[in-house]
Structures are given as C-alpha cells and as structure tokens.
Swiss-Prot record:
InterPro entries: YgfB-like (IPR011978), YgfB-like_sf (IPR036255)
Organism in which the protein naturally occurs: Vibrio cholerae serotype O1 (strain ATCC 39315 / El Tor Inaba N16961)
Entry GO CC: cytosol
Protein name, entry field: UPF0149 protein VC_2476
Similarity comment text for this entry: Belongs to the UPF0149 family.
Length: 191
C-alpha cells in the first residue's frame, strides 16, 4: 500500500528544485493526474517522454525525481479508480496569510497543469459528454480564482477548501469519461 502514497510536498519541492526542473509538486501532480484522466494507461511508458518534453525541453530527469513522479502516477491511478471517490491533491500546507496566497496559486497551477495533461494524453474533449464539458469549464473558471487581500481571509480560506473539493469532483467526472478503467488496464500476456 505504501507505493500508493503521495510524496511529501516540501521534500518533493526540494527534490524538483535541486534537479533544476521548472515544475513544482502541485503542477507535477496536476499534469500526471490530467494525463491519467485523459486516458493514459499505467502500462504506457510514453508519459515519461511527454513529461520530459513538457517540463525540461525533452531532457530526462534525475532518477530520484523520476521515481517521485512515478510514485505520484501510481498513487493517483489508484485513487482515481477507488470506489471511495477520495482524491488527495498535492498542495502546500501552512498557516497565515502568505500560506493562503501560496495555496491559492498552487490550486490554479494544479488545475492548469491538469488541463494540459488531458491534452497531452490525447483526450478527445470535442466529443465529451455535457457533464464532462461542464466539469472542464468549471476547472477553467476555478483556475482564474484568486485571494482578495481586502476580504476576510478566514472566509476566503473556507471558500478555497470548497473550491478544492469541487476540483476533485470535476477530476473524477473527467476520469470517468476518458480515463482507463481498471479492467481496460490489463497486463500484457507473457508466453
């Protein structure tokens, strides 16, 4: 079960920064979750080349960072097909005003990279159901939200938590439509 756990945000942020990769943990998880939700199979290793192209001008990643990305991919794959319908988003945690602004930025980055991941995986969004199109529109709108310094920050923190829950629901709708279902993700036959 430990293989299905997400890495800790601060440790992964440090690992990505040390590797000079232009992506943060929220963006990476959003990208990989979008790719899975768009139909990427765990048996398809093309995700690595797509991630390298998208984040590092086609150059490979250090082994540690790649292992962390694979850990995220495995964890999210398990969460997306779990009957509990629970998703864990890899977002920064903290207290105070600065942490709230950082969280809001990370949420927007997560969504934008999720949408990019859908596109990279080749999801045919033009032929999506009404529900899937609405979920995608909601995500696009939520990616534009921000924190207003003039308003009550406690109230905005609560609203941001509601937005995060709605993001999860939208992701599950899109994965239900485009993602590989467990019975579709079969292992190759060995002779």
């Amino acid at each position: 079960m430990s293989k299905n756990r997400l890495p800790a945000y601060p440790a992964l942020a440090n690992e990505l920064r040390t590797a000079s990769l232009g992506i943060n943990p929220a963006e990476l998880q959003g990208l990989l979750t979008g790719m899975l939700s768009g139909g990427l199979s765990l048996n398809d290793k093309s995700w690595q080349a797509l991630v390298f192209d998208y984040t590092n001008d086609g150059m490979g990643w250090p082994i540690g960072a790649l292992a962390s990305a694979e850990q995220i991919l495995l964890a999210m794959s398990a969460q997306l097909v779990d009957t509990d319908f629970e998703l864990s988003l890899l977002l920064p945690e903290g207290e105070g005003e600065e942490a709230l602004f950082e969280l809001a930025d990370a949420v927007a980055e997560w969504i934008n990279h999720f949408i990019s991941g859908l596109g990279l995986s080749g999801a045919n969004l033009k032929h999506a159901s009404v529900e899937a199109k609405e979920a995608l529109e909601d995500l696009e709108e939520m990616s534009k939200l921000g924190i207003d310094e003039e308003d009550d920050l406690a109230e905005q923190a609560e609203l941001l938590e509601q937005v995060i829950e709605h993001i999860k629901a939208c992701v599950l709708v899109l994965h239900a439509e485009f993602g590989v279902k467990p019975e579709q993700d079969t292992k190759p036959t060995v002779h």
